């Protein structure tokens, strides 16, 4: 992605496709100090639904004929056709207390976000004509290069595959870039500018040198992420997505929240990447509830309701965040095809263990099975279960997720004293 490392694990990164595990609905309190009887009720409710996750590659029963299946193999980064309909899921408090989720520029954020329209000459100079030595990532969307601007600023330059360009989407691309020009948050990778010329679509973003969350979970650098650090990362990501959903001039849906899109700084603070081509959400003031669009995303993280209805809302990001929470505490990828059948879909396996009262057995083996870790683990899984509810109406908002995680971290630190 936008870090300095390439994925050398040999594990196959989940492809961006249309199918994912589909947990059943659940809705209950997110109070981190919930009583044991309350937890029992949660487990009972969850136990009744934990076994009905569908296999991640089972196609939906009905498919809309006007949606092209070719969209499922690539990124949402460079193409989407959409229309808007319905009334907003959650508008309470929208754009209130904006200062909580914004940050003033510092030395690493010296440029105005997305304010520059680069030329091809600028890009060629920054990447030394797309030198293979400077390539730091590759995926369905295209290739990412490390580059340096004239003033010495290090950047990541994301170049789309030529096959993903669609001249009919030029206006939409430009309108979304303009919306993103107003986005600035400490936990979001900054978008410095872009290029749209002929069959080239390129975005220039902040360079974050310490690799991805996925790499750190697999200990590529030899260091184990503590549960304390994992909670910090979860909160950082929750704040970033809350900002996109609630505190921007127009709500933005990330649409591809996953561990390989979370970059870490030298101090292990998280920055959400790959939001430069996210979808603009339905505008609450217009009375719309969702954006209808082709399904794009990554296997294992995809919202089953979005997959079934083609209706995209902020709650699709909440579902992906729930999968990310499970990934954080287990250390496993969302889909691990080489494991035993009942463990291949990590969220299904983890929720089954949680509802059976043996949540500690799914804790990342690199972490200590202490009382404090076990208690925090159960609370995190409780929140994750709500996030992956099959119906979006039963999922919390990202702001609520951030609040719950703050309480979990507070309680966890008190346990450690």
Can you say where each PLM-predicted feature lies in the sequence?
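A positional/structural detector of protein chain ends, strongest at the extreme C-terminus
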Residues: 1-4, 415-417
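Conserved eukaryotic protein kinase-like
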Residues: 84-417
């Amino acid at each position: 992605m936008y870090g300095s490392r390439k994925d050398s694990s040999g594990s196959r990164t989940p492809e961006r496709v249309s199918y994912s595990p589909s947990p059943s609905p659940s809705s209950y309190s997110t109070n981190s100090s919930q009583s044991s009887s309350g937890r029992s009720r949660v487990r009972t409710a969850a136990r009744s639904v934990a076994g009905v996750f569908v296999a991640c590659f089972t196609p939906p029963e009905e498919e809309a004929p006007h949606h092209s299946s070719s969209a499922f193999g690539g990124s949402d980064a460079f193409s989407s056709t959409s229309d808007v309909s319905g009334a907003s899921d959650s508008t309470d408090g929208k754009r209130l207390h904006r200062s909580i989720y914004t940050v003033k520029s510092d030395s690493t954020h010296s440029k105005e976000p997305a304010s520059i329209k680069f030329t091809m000459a600028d890009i060629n100079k920054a990447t030394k004509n797309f030198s293979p030595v400077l390539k730091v990532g590759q995926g369905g969307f295209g290739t990412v290069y490390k580059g340096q601007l004239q003033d010495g600023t290090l950047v990541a330059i994301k170049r789309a595959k030529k096959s993903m360009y669609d001249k009919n989407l030029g206006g939409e691309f430009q309108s979304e870039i303009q919306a993103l020009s107003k986005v600035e948050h400490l936990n979001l990778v900054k978008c410095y500018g872009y290029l749209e010329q002929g069959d080239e679509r390129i975005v220039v973003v902040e360079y974050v040198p310490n690799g991805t969350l996925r790499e750190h979970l697999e200990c590529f650098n030899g260091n184990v992420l503590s549960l304390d650090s994992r909670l910090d990362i979860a909160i950082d990501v929750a704040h970033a997505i809350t900002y996109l959903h609630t505190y921007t001039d127009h709500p933005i849906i990330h649409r591809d929240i996953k561990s390989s899109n979370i970059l870490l700084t030298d101090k292990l603070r998280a920055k959400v990447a790959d939001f430069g081509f996210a979808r603009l959400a339905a505008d609450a003031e217009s009375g719309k509830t969702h954006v209808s669009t082709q399904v794009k995303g990554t296997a294992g993280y995809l919202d089953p309701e979005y997959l079934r209805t083609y209706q995209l809302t902020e709650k699709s990001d909440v579902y992906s965040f729930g999968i990310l929470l499970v990934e954080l505490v287990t250390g496993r990828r969302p889909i691990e095809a080489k494991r035993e059948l009942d463990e291949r879909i990590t969220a299904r396996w983890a929720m089954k263990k949680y509802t059976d009262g043996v949540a500690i057995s799914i804790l990342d083996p690199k972490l200590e099975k202490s009382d404090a870790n076990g208690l925090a683990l159960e609370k995190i899984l409780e929140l994750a279960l709500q996030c992956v509810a099959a119906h979006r109406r039963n999922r919390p908002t990202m702001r609520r997720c951030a609040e719950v995680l703050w309480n979990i971290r507070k309680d966890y630190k008190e346990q450690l004293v």
